[in-house]
Regions:
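Eukaryotic intrinsically disordered, low-complexity regulatory linkers and tails enriched in Ser/Thr/Pro
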Residues: 1-2, 11-18, 27-148
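Acidic (E/D-rich), amphipathic helical modules within compact regulatory domains
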Residues: 21
């Protein structure tokens, strides 16, 4: 999956690339990395292979994932699968990335996810968050992290 100015492009081996314009995305974007979750209700999930895929050993680099979303015109539920690299994904960062994508879509600014400069700035701010006090919702943590 590639985030571009005009929308998300799904690259699937052997088939033509599929462009999903930002205007079709509604209600946010969920992220699951790895497999093995049963749907916790959170927008960002890190399954068992997602956890193992960042550790040294035979699972390193395994456990791709998917972006899940509801599209309009026509209405449909979609999952766009992706491969992963062998870097470690902190559960906090997966959750905050999902929250960033969801809040950006909810604000009517889905196109910003295709703006490389803005996305780099936002992700850079989220990388500074390592944990947060119990009881704080990801939305509040995200808003505080992106505040100038």
């Amino acid at each position: 999956v590639e985030l571009r100015t005009e929308g998300m492009v799904r690259h699937a081996g052997g088939t033509e690339d599929e462009l999903i314009p930002w205007s079709r995305v509604m209600l946010g974007i969920g992220i699951q990395i790895g497999h093995g979750t049963k749907g916790s209700g959170y927008q960002g999930e890190l399954g068992l292979t997602g956890l193992l895929g960042g550790l040294p050993g035979p699972f390193k680099g395994r456990g791709g994932g998917h972006l899940s979303m509801t599209l309009r015109h026509p209405y449909e539920e979609r999952k766009l699968t992706f491969d992963r690299h062998a870097e470690w994904y902190k559960p906090t960062h997966v959750l905050l990335l999902a929250e960033l994508m969801t809040q950006t879509v909810a604000a009517g600014d889905a196109h910003r996810l295709g703006d490389a400069e803005w996305l780099e700035w936002a992700i850079g701010r989220l990388e500074l968050v390592t944990s947060w006090p119990l009881g704080r919702q990801p939305a509040a943590v995200l808003q505080a992290a992106l505040k100038d």
